[in-house]
Amino acid sequence: MKKIDGGVTAPQGYLAAGVKAGIKASGNHDVAVIYSTVPAACGAVFTQNKMCAAPVLVSREVNKQPYAQAILVNSGCANACTGAQGIEDAKKMQDHGAELLGIEPEQAFICSTGVIGHFLPMDKLLTGIADAIDAMDETEGESCAMAIQTTDTFIKKAAYETEIDGKLVKIAGIAKGAGMIHPNMATMLTFITTDCAIAPDVLKRAVKAAADKSFNMVVVDGDTSTNDSMIVLANGLAENEIILSEEHPDYPAFFEMLVACATDLAKLIAHDGEGATKFLEVNVVGAASWQDAKTAAMAIAKSPLVKTAFFGEDPNWGRIVCAAGYSGAEMIAEKVNLEIGGVRLVENGMNCNVPAERLAPIMAEHDISMTIDLAAGEEKATVWTCDFSYEYVKINGEYHT
């Protein structure tokens, strides 16, 4: 497997574009389209927030189909908490794009992101969809990635290629997300394309499994959004022997590539946490179960006290072991060990009395890894997060305006 440059148009048979439709007050790109030139197996996972937005309800119906061909996206307005009109507007968005693309509406996923509680500006949106479809080609992946952003500070993309059944198979993805990140899948927008030939039912299961290993292991602020989604299209144009089950000899290679792409995007989202100055990797080892390991890691990663300590470059390890302790994960307290940046701070549940000056260079780094051993078993899990800064409060205090 090899990492390559490129966005969602890197695999064969995909066109994309992003345009400025005037939905965002900033005037930035705000409408995007991703299109497969042939029907593609599809798989998706969506937010578990019970106040899910209208486009999520519509796209869940699309995901019941084996194949799809398009993803239509707007940013700047979430179309959430908009009642019956929101559903009607979402379907108009879907119908309009499908008609222009010459496909059935149920072959078009739709996604929206932005401020909750406002109706979509339909005239601008429908014009934007038409403009994006007119502009789409194999070189416009960058503008497409720009158009799905809200408070993001940089484009998030990843791509890989590998040989499957003697054929060169590519996978590529883009993502949006900086705040409201505590996926259960999902709390972000993620779109992945591949030219691998894989059966729709196998792809749907693979997408859920990949989300659990990547996006569901990221937390920025502990909030779960109303909108966001992970959607994968696989159009088969690589012409490998179709992967019909998880037992197929080529399935592991495909799944490894899918997880790698998703994990890269997930880490980029943690790097771009609103106002973030640190990227934090939380490793839990020695857990009684994988779920316990994830539970403890999430508790540490979500803790405002932990996140603010890292912003202040304060090696307050007590906050880390405290969060693990209240997480509910099984542990043997008198055997717990903790390291930050490879330096042992806690051994057998007690302070190692490491001098502050030894830790200062580690705490000043942008990327910091910590590992806590619960001494309760052999399982492990890793969660990615970021710190909480003054800027995070400022961004979210001013977001609506």
Q: What residues fall within each predicted segment?
A:
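Generic structural marker for isolated residues within well-ordered, non-membrane alpha-helices
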Residues: 94
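A structural signal for small-residue-enriched, beta-sheet-centric alpha/beta enzyme cores
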Residues: 1-74, 78-89, 98-401
